[in-house]
């Protein structure tokens, strides 16, 4: 019979049994080697309030602690929440991690597209042609 994945969807090579874990989202039992695991490092304070907390801090140069969480998902929850994506039959064989896209700078103005006139200031529509 043909096979879909080289590893059978698991990381269990030469092991007979692997203990199950519970999915962080739905609580379903899933083998530990089959679960999709992500280690999340976040700031405890949200981005909008970091400056306020640092200014209100008594200690100079106090670094805010981070929140470390390991999440383990079953396959269906990982696909549903877009942690992993369904890939085509040929792309399933690709083992390199997907490219991480860099965040855009929001404060830099976009360069003008070639062949387009600049937009008028104030966001008002241009005068109609006569």
From Swiss-Prot:
The GO molecular function terms of this record are: mRNA binding; structural constituent of ribosome
State the organism named in the record: Arabidopsis thaliana
Which residues lie within the region annotated Disordered?
Answer: 86-130
Q: What segments bear the compositional bias annotation Basic residues?
A: 86-95
Belongs to which family?
Belongs to the eukaryotic ribosomal protein eS26 family.
* One GO cellular component term noted in the UniProt record for this chain: cytosolic small ribosomal subunit
PANTHER family membership: 40S RIBOSOMAL PROTEIN S26
Domain of life of the native organism: Eukaryota
Keywords tagged on the record:
Ribonucleoprotein, Ribosomal protein
- Protein name in UniProt: Small ribosomal subunit protein eS26x
List compositional bias (Low complexity) regions by residue number: 113-130
Q: Name one GO biological process term.
A: translation
């Amino acid at each position: 019979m043909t096979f879909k994945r080289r590893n059978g969807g698991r990381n269990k090579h030469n092991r007979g049994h692997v203990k199950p874990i519970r999915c962080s989202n739905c609580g379903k039992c899933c083998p530990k080697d089959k679960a999709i695991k992500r280690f999340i490092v976040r700031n405890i304070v949200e981005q909008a309030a970091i400056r306020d907390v640092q200014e209100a801090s008594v200690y100079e140069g106090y670094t805010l602690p981070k929140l470390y969480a390991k999440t383990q998902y079953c396959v269906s929850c990982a696909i549903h929440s877009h942690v992993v994506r369904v890939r085509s039959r040929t792309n399933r064989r690709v083992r390199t991690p997907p490219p991480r896209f860099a965040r855009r700078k929001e404060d830099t103005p976009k360069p003008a597209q070639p062949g387009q006139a600049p937009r008028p200031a104030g966001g008002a529509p241009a005068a109609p042609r006569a």
